[in-house]
Amino acid sequence: DGRYMRSWLEPVPGSLSFPGLPTSRHYGIKPEPLAARRGDCTTFDTHTLSLSDLPCGSPPVDRDKQSHEGAFSENNGESEANGEKPHIDPNNPAANWLHARSTRKKRCPYTKHQTLELEKEFLFNMYLTRDRRYEVARLLNLTERQVKIWFQNRRMKMKKINKDRAKDE
């Protein structure tokens, strides 16, 4: 039903919108912090459209065209009849969930050097202290999170190998 979608995307007649202030229409939705609004490229671990999906330095109008071009070509016949495209505010979380893209990074395999060093470290110690994790990450040009997850996965692999070995005997 188009009326529910339109209520989020089109401004309510007679209402004013002030950037940075929540409006009465967005009950229970936490507004984004002002620091991450414009020009800041930060990474979020959420699965909604964030400013990190948009190119830095481009004006907000260009960003809007790039991220939402043709998004309503089949759903919004009323706007097409008028010859205008609906304006979608990239700072409005209520509109963004309709066009959410995953912000997950593509899978990037470790280099042979990184794998070798991680395996050596694992043979020496299956668990890393926070300081050692920081050091390994810095030496291998990885994030601490990547090192932490690699060690978690390696421990699970070890557990599986041991279980299979016990089953075979």
Swiss-Prot record:
Molecular-function GO terms, alphabetical: DNA-binding transcription factor activity; DNA-binding transcription factor activity, RNA polymerase II-specific; RNA polymerase II cis-regulatory region sequence-specific DNA binding
Superkingdom of origin organism: Eukaryota
Region called Disordered, residue ranges: 52-95
Alphabetical list of SUPFAM superfamilies matching this protein: Homeodomain-like
Biological processes annotated in GO: anterior/posterior pattern specification; DNA-templated transcription; embryonic skeletal system morphogenesis; proximal/distal pattern formation; regulation of transcription by RNA polymerase II
Cellular compartment(s): Nucleus
Entry keyword Nucleus: yes
UniProt keyword list: Developmental protein, DNA-binding, Homeobox, Nucleus, Transcription, Transcription regulation
DNA-binding region: 103-162
Function: Sequence-specific transcription factor which is part of a developmental regulatory system that provides cells with specific positional identities on the anterior-posterior axis.
Similarity remark: Belongs to the Abd-B homeobox family.
Protein name: Homeobox protein Hox-A9
